[in-house]
UniProtKB/Swiss-Prot annotation:
This is Lon protease 1. The gene is lon1. It holds the Pfam family Lon_C. It comes from Bacillus subtilis (strain 168). Induction: By heat shock. Belongs to the peptidase S16 family. One of its GO terms (cellular component) is cytoplasm. Keywords: ATP-binding, Cytoplasm, Hydrolase, Nucleotide-binding, Protease, Serine protease, Stress response. NCBIfam families: lon (TIGR00763), PRK10787.1 (NF008053). GO terms for biological process: cellular response to heat; protein quality control for misfolded or incompletely synthesized proteins. The active site is at S677, K720. The keyword ATP-binding applies. ATP binds at G354, P355, P356, G357, V358, G359, K360, T361. GO terms for molecular function: ATP binding; ATP hydrolysis activity; ATP-dependent peptidase activity; sequence-specific DNA binding; serine-type endopeptidase activity. The lineage of its organism: Bacteria, Bacillati, Bacillota, Bacilli, Bacillales. ATP-dependent serine protease that mediates the selective degradation of mutant and abnormal proteins as well as certain short-lived regulatory proteins. Required for cellular homeostasis and for survival from DNA damage and developmental changes induced by stress. Degrades polypeptides processively to yield small peptide fragments that are 5 to 10 amino acids long. Binds to DNA in a double-stranded, site-specific manner. Has been implicated in preventing sigma(G) activity under non-sporulation conditions.
Amino acid sequence: MAEELKRSIPLLPLRGLLVYPTMVLHLDVGRDKSVQALEQAMMHDHMIFLATQQDISIDEPGEDEIFTVGTYTKIKQMLKLPNGTIRVLVEGLKRAHIVKYNEHEDYTSVDIQLIHEDDSKDTEDEALMRTLLDHFDQYIKISKKISAETYAAVTDIEEPGRMADIVASHLPLKLKDKQDILETADVKDRLNKVIDFINNEKEVLEIEKKIGQRVKRSMERTQKEYYLREQMKAIQKELGDKEGKTGEVQTLTEKIEEAGMPDHVKETALKELNRYEKIPSSSAESSVIRNYIDWLVALPWTDETDDKLDLKEAGRLLDEEHHGLEKVKERILEYLAVQKLTKSLKGPILCLAGPPGVGKTSLAKSIAKSLGRKFVRISLGGVRDESEIRGHRRTYVGAMPGRIIQGMKKAGKLNPVFLLDEIDKMSSDFRGDPSSAMLEVLDPEQNSSFSDHYIEETFDLSKVLFIATANNLATIPGPLRDRMEIINIAGYTEIEKLEIVKDHLLPKQIKEHGLKKSNLQLRDQAILDIIRYYTREAGVRSLERQLAAICRKAAKAIVAEERKRITVTEKNLQDFIGKRIFRYGQAETEDQVGVVTGLAYTTVGGDTLSIEVSLSPGKGKLILTGKLGDVMRESAQAAFSYVRSKTEELGIEPDFHEKYDIHIHVPEGAVPKDGPSAGITMATALVSALTGRAVSREVGMTGEITLRGRVLPIGGLKEKALGAHRAGLTTIIAPKDNEKDIEDIPESVREGLTFILASHLDEVLEHALVGEKK
């Protein structure tokens, strides 16, 4: 047997198949290196070497992952398909084994030695060929998957080696067995191996036929699914598997015993298990019962997490991850203290209410961490179906427990911190009211025996620390709101945001963008400018996005320009994040008649709000512009009526309403405005315009007015004071009843403001109006 060396033949690794000599077949080629190997072969003599991978899951096999014996092959035809792959028609020529691998830039070639075989045959070869044909004929008759034409073509083959290869290619052999035949160079050995493989396949087919006949006798013709299951039974019987469900039932029994269920739940589980054992596996009810038992054993009936009762450590963890939010932190530490003393306190039900981005969800995670408990979160936004909370009854196809029970299974503990995110976004429709279903979950007197429609057994939720989050408390139904302890989280002040950026957000973004602390420095004034002019929010989400934009610019400068340190100041800030997006109200530059600076409270914090009054000849018509809401319009009417009733005391012409039309305008007319807190501001502007006395530019005011001139309390004084301080005002006139709210204002802001607390409009006018009547 002589061998011939061929050098630098492009290599095409095959996955899950191989090619014997004289075989002609199509191949679809898509891997880049394989495509390049084909291109190289087509540019030269159209010859390529096909070798099979040992593991089909590998995309780029190495030398040790390819069988060394393959087929020296000629490419007959090549076609590029629209999807980028290539379809080739190849013809196997000779066996060969790899001598050396040659790695090129985008493909691999090999040096191979052709394995020549003797085509002559002796009497033993003739006998083996006849035996092979006889067994192949029997195999075809049993399998009925190979055509008579194929058998006829095989009988015409004269070469014994070629006959063995062709027959082997038609057998459903494992890849390693086909490779074994390819590697067998001796023709007699190859014929014997193929005969052995055929005999083995015949035995397998006979057993399959026997199983099929046994099943067919015991089934109805129309029950196709039943036939398949009976066939599986027959296979198990043939293998001697008589165990059935016994082992499975034993395992489930042990799980039920170890689950720590209450006695009544355990009794139900064992009863269902008894039903499961008796019902055939082919029954649809069988899988329903099994799924139910799996849920029962997976729930944490008694398994609890031991609380970390170290108040100092818990406080440190909360302070480390969140700036401010003192009320929430204090409430958690109070809970821990009582838990340490009593050892058996029911979990509180808290609702963190506040605008987006102030850290409600992340605070809940920190609370779980400080307590050492598991954390579970479910989003209730858009939930409309009561079954989402309580689950579906098992009579429905595909029934599942509700989100509460699913969350408890996920936690794996009886006392997790359970976050009910966006509880104010639930709504109801024809499928029920999920907020009503939440009443039982969030009632400390009832949730120790919570009942899910799917589980149908009571489950104790009393040890769970439920934390709900909401943006708008007004959309939460009253009974549900009454069950929760509301903790309002106001927006952060500029100073708080500055500290959050320096302590939390900036270090986080620097790390996420692959920078070092020494690479990027933001000056405090630059951070304040970002807060004031590039974000308008109560929280810090947009602020974090702007910091991320700065970090990206810095990363580009460091990589592309090889700079070591980037410093961002208020002067070069626009180079990083562009022009300013927002502007806040500013104090007036001079005292003016009929122009008063009011204070407004929005969802993104406090701001100033100018109110202008103009007189024009007319018949006392009151004109209101600036996209004012109904409440604000009524405040203007009340202020107007009060001024008309007090003309003598205020030094105004009694018949002014017969001479002038009065126009009250609030600038930024595209922005909707509403609320009663601009009452004293409008009244002051009216008096200023009618008396000709200017209003101090340094004064901002807020308060509701009555027809008797009383000044009533308002909300959001803290945020309004922050807006006034930012705008450069020095004096704030506020209702006397809001005195208690002043202590909530940061000390750094209080120091720069003078607060005048008024209970009547006379006090407001005394401090707001300057100069003499004109």
